[in-house]
């Protein structure tokens, strides 16, 4: 469960970092850039912790996909970026793809399965 929390925090940090970058660009303040660097760094660190137990493909798809979804929505609300039916359709397809990817992923075997496979590789056969 903690690894999913790491992933949620990574997504949140990515969204905050990216929005801070836009804020800094619009307002010309260095604070936005500093927040961006800190949050993007935190996002990658948290993502690396999350993929210890969450499948990489699922974690990355959720990290990027949900990040794109929230960044787009907040950009429309806060920075008056245009929104169209085409963007809405793209976001809907994105969400459908994430759901399909998540539902099609098997549960990880855990460390014991991985360690057993690694031991098999290191033993010589006679």
Curated annotation (Swiss-Prot):
InterPro entries, sorted: Small_drug/metabolite_transptr, Small_multidrug_res, Spermidine_export_MdtJ
SUPFAM superfamilies, A to Z:
Multidrug resistance efflux transporter EmrE
Q: Which domain of life is it from?
A: Bacteria
Q: GO molecular function, one example? A: choline transmembrane transporter activity
Q: Which GO terms describe its biological process?
A: glycine betaine transport
What Pfam families does the record tag this protein with?
A: Multi_Drug_Res
Task: Give the UniProt subcellular location, in the record's own words.
Answer: Cell inner membrane
Any one GO cellular component localisation term in the record: plasma membrane
The membrane topology noted for this protein in its Swiss-Prot or TrEMBL record is:
Multi-pass membrane protein
Q: List UniProt keywords, sorted A-Z.
A: Cell inner membrane, Cell membrane, Membrane, Transmembrane, Transmembrane helix, Transport
Q: Among its keywords, does the record have Transmembrane?
A: yes
Give a yes or no for keyword Nucleus in this entry: no
Q: Which residues span the membrane? A: 1-21, 30-50, 54-74, 81-101
Family listed: Belongs to the drug/metabolite transporter (DMT) superfamily. Small multidrug resistance (SMR) (TC 2.A.7.1) family. MdtJ subfamily.
Q: How does it assemble?
A: Forms a complex with MdtI.
Q: What does this protein do?
A: Catalyzes the excretion of spermidine.
Q: What is this protein called?
A: Spermidine export protein MdtJ
Instruction: Report which gene this protein is encoded by.
Output: mdtJ
